UniProtKB/Swiss-Prot annotation:
Similarity remark: Belongs to the SIX/Sine oculis homeobox family.
Tissue specificity annotation: Mainly expressed in the skeletal muscle (isoform 1 and isoform 2 but not isoform 3), and weakly in the heart. Also found in the retina and the distal tube of kidney. Expressed in skeletal muscle, nasal epithelium, cochlea, parathyroid and salivary gland. Expressed in muscle satellite cells of normal and regenerating muscles.
Organism encoding this protein: Mus musculus (Mouse)
Record carries keyword Repressor: no
Gene (UniProt): Six4
Protein name: Homeobox protein SIX4
Residues that bear Phosphoserine: S634
Length: 775
């Protein structure tokens, strides 16, 4: 029997404890290496755990194991090993690693790594830090963790960090930038494309900043006052600056080119919608003004002519009486009820009142009105030169094609005229009512009207009544009633009542042909109204040098009206009843013409007998120095001709009236040889012999106005002889632009304005012997 001694047992127990301690220590070291290696390896993966297991946890586990071993050993020898076990326990407790740096040191290292841009080292430093209550809530550490999370693309952790802690305002700009950039990056990944400014704005509205990194105050960006003033000045001058101007403005204001462009875009948009931005705008404090897009939508109602000094043409047309508001040519503002106007090449369809304004446009409808030129009545199709225009009729000594290029001075002398006529067939009276009130233009009472003298027709012929033209300042107003059988007179022009001239070789019409020219001799205007009723007018375009027309023979009684006018007024002489075998008496009484003090135009009135068909002979030209009453009929002058035409009239008694004939371009002259008996010379009666003096041309009339005179040879021996070879020479007015030819006789006028009183020519009775024969 052997028994171990107590000392041996104690020694063996001590050896066991020592061995257990060594094993536990080695296990603790291995565990520490494993944890440390795992922590070091955890830095390399792209998405490591944000807070790995700290090394102190392994030390605590080893400490627990050592305590258990020490407790077991102490049970064996509580007395002898008490001090040793206590020392070992203290040694194990001292083995836990303490915090190597203070919180300030950790924050300084984080800031240094952030500023240096070493985000990978910052991430490794953060993983190496132990969990400590001292580091909990450190703002520098949280900011560093947020920056590392953004760098590694762990956006949910970033949002969690930013929303869980209230940061100081000094850190708000950086953290706000991280917030928005993270949102933008997520959206770009989801959409697969870069975001635009609008997309980013919508994301900012969808994901507002948390209050932890935002104080809740919105900052409105505003340019400096100097920059805003420079932008405003350029905006006043030009709302659409060029790129060069934008670059220059950006250089002056210190802004970028994009900022300048956006400012102009926003300002124009605010000005387009002034009702939406009544408050002050972001970039300037001035209320919005009207933009250019709202221009052009102004009121189309008539405006006062006195207030419209920018050369704007105002027209207002009605369906019954057509008052025309006129001003100098410019932009056209038209107010139409049931009318149409063609201005500056733009056609406005019309049903009742087409207007030819200042020779710039032509409109056709129920009433054709050509201001300062020609008036065409109802149901017409005027086309005497189809290849060029739909209306080429000579009026007021100027072809319509010439009027198209006339200046505004030709339009200044508009007159106010009212005309009324009685249709003998239907016995219906057409007369214009009182002048329509012109809003803002002129009251009705300011238009003076002289008395109207109406001469009734004995055999049912038409009676044309003219009132006195009234001049209102430099603007004219024309009133034209919608009458189907009246000849209308506008400023010494001719008017055609129902006349149909379609653009074909032959045109026929069953209606009234009223050609009413104005003539002057001495110091007054004279005019002979004449009509052809229920007749036909045939226009047969020949070669460019001749036009033949035929007027059927019909006996009518023509009455006339005499009027005393204002400045440039009209005095209408009388015409006696005439037929093919009757006598024509057309005279100008001196008492009707003297003392009027009117400025004359250069023309005269002569009645010429006409046949059913006759040709037109080529005209001859007389220079202004040769224009005197003593010129013979057969005196031709070959010279280049001017670009003006004459106004002619044909009556129902087969005679033509010509006046205001100006020179015609030589290449445009049309000639037709007198192959058959066409016209005979006129012999005035010996009752009165009046010396014809040269007349004066008014300065407002065409300066280059001259007369084209044509002599008519003695074709038939039974015609009366012309006495004294006065200025009553046969006249042919012809223009290839107008294709409208009329024969007649006119008295020449000179251009000298210094001539004083002129004697008036009196036309004597014409004896018509027999009818003319057709060509």
């Amino acid at each position: 029997m052997s028994s171990s001694s107590p000392t041996g047992q104690i020694a063996s127990a001590a050896d066991i404890k020592q061995e257990n301690g060594m094993e536990s220590a080695s296990e603790g070291q291995e565990a520490h290496r494993e944890v440390a290696g795992g922590a070091a390896a955890g830095l390399s993966p792209p998405a490591p755990a944000p807070f790995p297991l700290e090394p102190g946890d392994a030390a605590a586990a080893s400490r627990v194991s050592r305590e258990e071993g020490a407790a077991a050993a102490g049970a064996a020898d509580q007395v002898q090993l008490h001090s040793e076990l206590l020392g070992r326990h203290q040694h194990a407790a001292a083995a836990q690693p303490p915090l190597a740096f203070s919180p300030d040191h950790v924050a300084c290292v984080c800031e240094a790594l952030q500023q240096g841009g070493n985000l990978d080292r910052l991430a490794r430093f953060l993983w190496s830090l132990p969990q400590s209550d001292l580091l909990r809530g450190n703002e520098s550490l949280l900011k560093a963790r947020a920056l590392v999370a953004f760098h590694q693309g762990i956006y949910p952790e970033l949002y969690s960090i930013l929303e869980s802690h209230s940061f100081e305002s000094a850190n708000h700009p950086l953290l706000q930038q991280l917030w928005y950039k993270a949102r933008y990056t997520e959206a770009e990944r989801a959409r697969g494309r870069p975001l635009g400014a609008v997309d980013k704005y919508r994301l900012r509205r969808k994901f507002p900043l948390p209050r932890t990194i935002w104080d809740g105050e919105e900052t409105v960006y505003c340019f400096k006052e100097k920059s805003r003033n420079a932008l405003k000045e350029l905006y006043k001058q030009n709302r659409y600056p060029s790129p060069a101007e934008k670059r220059h403005l950006a250089k002056i204001t210190g802004l970028s080119l994009t900022q300048v462009s956006n400012w102009f875009k926003n300002r124009r948009q605010r000005d387009r919608n002034p009702s939406e931005t009544q408050s002050k705008s972001e970039s300037d404090g001035n209320p919005s003004t009207e933009d250019e897009s709202s221009k052009g939508h102004e009121d189309l109602s008539p405006h006062p002519l006195s207030g419209a000094s920018d050369g704007v043409t105002n027209l207002s047309l009605s369906s019954h009486v057509e008052p025309v508001y006129m001003q100098q040519i410019g932009n056209a503002k038209i107010s139409l009820s049931s009318s149409g106007v063609l201005l500056n090449g733009s056609l406005v369809p019309a049903s009742t009142s087409p207007v030819f304004l200042n020779g710039n446009s032509f409109i056709q409808g129920h009433n054709g009105v050509i201001l300062n030129g020609l008036n065409v009545g109802n149901t017409q199709t005027v086309s005497l030169n189809p290849p060029k225009m739909s209306s080429n009729i000579v009026g007021n000594g100027i072809a319509m094609t010439d009027i198209l290029g006339s200046t505004s001075q030709d339009v200044k002398e508009f007159k106010v005229l009212q005309s009324s006529a009685v249709n003998s067939a239907a016995t219906t009276s057409y007369s214009p009512s009182a002048p329509v009130s012109f809003p803002g233009l002129i009251p009705c009472t300011e238009v003076k009207r002289e008395g109207i003298q109406t001469v009734a027709s004995q055999d049912g012929g038409s009676v044309v009544t003219f009132t006195t033209p009234v001049q209102i300042n430099q603007y004219g107003i024309v009133q034209i009633p919608n009458s189907g059988a009246n000849g209308q007179f506008l400023n010494g022009s001719i008017g055609f009542s129902p006349l149909q001239l379609p653009p074909v070789s032959v045109a026929a019409s069953q209606g009234n042909l009223s050609v009413t020219p104005s003539t002057s001799d001495g110091s007054t205007f004279t005019s002979e109204p004449a009509t052809v009723q229920h007749g036909k007018l045939f226009l047969s375009p020949l070669t460019p040098s001749a036009v033949v027309y035929t007027v059927p023979n019909s006996g009518q009684t023509v009455g006339a009206v005499k009027q005393e006018g204002l400045e440039r007024g009209l005095v209408f002489s009388q015409l006696m009843p005439v037929n093919h075998s009757a006598q024509v008496n057309a005279s100008l009484s001196s008492e009707n013409l003297s003392g009027s003090g009117l400025h004359p135009l250069t023309s005269s009135l002569v009645n010429v007998s006409a046949a059913h068909g006759f040709s037109l002979t080529p005209p001859t030209l007389l220079n202004p120095t040769e224009l005197n009453p003593d010129l013979a009929e057969s005196q031709p002058v070959s010279a280049p001709v001017a670009s003006k035409c004459t106004v002619s009239s044909v009556s129902n008694t087969n005679y033509a009236t010509l006046q205001n004939c100006s020179l015609i371009p030589g290449q445009d002259l049309l000639s037709g040889p007198m192959t058959q008996a066409a016209l005979g010379e006129i012999v005035p009666t010996a009752e009165e012999q009046v010396s014809h003096a040269s007349t004066a041309v008014h300065q407002d009339f065409v300066r280059e106005q001259r007369l084209v005179l044509q002599s008519v040879p003695n074709i038939k021996e039974n015609f009366l002889q012309n006495s004294e070879n006065k200025a009553t020479n046969n006249l042919m007015m012809l223009d290839s632009k107008s294709k409208y030819v009329l024969d007649g006789m006119v008295e020449a006028g000179c251009e000298d304005l210094g001539t004083d009183k002129k004697e008036l020519a009196k036309l004597q009775t014409v004896q018509l012997d027999e009818d003319m024969q057709d060509l």
